[in-house]
Amino acid sequence: MENGAVYSPTTEEDPGPARGPRSGLAAYCFLGRLPLLRRVLKGLQLSLSLLAFICEEVVSQCTLCGGLYFFEFVSCSAFLLSLLILIVYCTPFYERVDTTKVKSSDFYITLGTGCVFLLASIIFVSTHDRTSAEIAAIVFGFIASFMFLLDFVTMLYEKRQESQLRKSENTTRAEALTEPLNA
């Protein structure tokens, strides 16, 4: 018997380059774990906090530097934290860690970063020297802090939806258990 006749009906064709598996860094990055709105918000948080940090770094002199230094620390920290959370969501590391812990960490990190970034932007507004780089940094800082807070509100809404869904499942189960068996 010829091998072609035995294996022909069960083997698949070579998928070729169009359908082939992803290679390189693309094989390790998967954006589907976050809904589209959350992906957009995470991308905006990352880019806006980086832009705020870059604009702040362009400032060459200041009279009241405390607000500038605090804003520098917060904008850099916000960029690094949002990059870290995005890396965790998009890489295989997400499957190695408990997903509830990742979501809980993201929830509290996003809330804390948004509040502190908003505070840093308010402080920087009161101490800046009105240069164009400072104004740009302040604008990016406020927008970034609002993106963090909007992401927090989105996560809060998702949590409430999940808890209401679980509550309705529990009540239907309880009703089914209290019905008489011979009815």
Curated annotation (Swiss-Prot):
Keyword Membrane among UniProt keywords: yes
PROSITE patterns recorded: MARVEL
Transmembrane segments: 40-60, 68-88, 107-127, 135-155
Cytoplasmic side: 1-39, 89-106, 156-183
Principal subcellular localization: membrane
Keywords: Acetylation, Cell membrane, Endosome, Membrane, Phosphoprotein, Transmembrane, Transmembrane helix, Transport
Region (Disordered): 1-20
Extracellular compartment segments: 61-67, 128-134
Compartments, as annotated in UniProt: Cell membrane; Early endosome membrane; Recycling endosome membrane
Any one Gene Ontology cellular component term annotated for this protein: early endosome membrane
Residues annotated with N-acetylmethionine modification: 1
Location of Phosphoserine modifications: 8
Domain MARVEL residues, every copy: 33-160
Modified residues (Phosphothreonine): 171
Its membrane topology: Multi-pass membrane protein
UniProt KW Transmembrane keyword: yes
Record note on quaternary structure: Interacts with PD-L1/CD274 (via transmembrane domain); the interaction is direct. Interacts with CMTM4. Interacts with CD58, ARG1, ENO1 and TMPO.
UniProt similarity note: Belongs to the chemokine-like factor family.
Function: Master regulator of recycling and plasma membrane expression of PD-L1/CD274, an immune inhibitory ligand critical for immune tolerance to self and antitumor immunity. Associates with both constitutive and IFNG-induced PD-L1/CD274 at recycling endosomes, where it protects PD-L1/CD274 from being targeted for lysosomal degradation, likely by preventing its ubiquitination. May stabilize PD-L1/CD274 expression on antigen presenting cells and potentiates inhibitory signaling by PDCD1/CD279, its receptor on T-cells, ultimately triggering T-cell anergy.
Name this protein carries in UniProt: CKLF-like MARVEL transmembrane domain-containing protein 6
Organism name: Pongo abelii
